[in-house]
Swiss-Prot record:
Family annotation (InterPro entries): Bradykinin
Family the UniProt entry places it in: Belongs to the bradykinin-related peptide family.
Pfam family of the protein (one): Bradykinin
Tissue distribution of the protein: Expressed by the skin glands.
Species for this entry: Pithecopus azureus (Orange-legged monkey tree frog)
Keywords: Amphibian defense peptide, G-protein coupled receptor impairing toxin, Hydroxylation, Secreted, Toxin, Vasoactive, Vasodilator
Example of a GO MF term: toxin activity
PTM sites of type 4-hydroxyproline: 2
KW Metal-binding (keyword) present: no
Name of the protein described by the UniProt record: [Val1,Hyp2,Thr6]-bradykinyl-Gln,Ser
Function: May produce in vitro relaxation of rat arterial smooth muscle and constriction of intestinal smooth muscle. May target bradykinin receptors (BDKRB).
Length: 11
């Protein structure tokens, strides 16, 4: 997954 990506939030 890309840095800073979570399945819960993307900012």
């Amino acid at each position: 997954v890309p840095p800073g990506f979570t399945p819960f939030r993307q900012s």
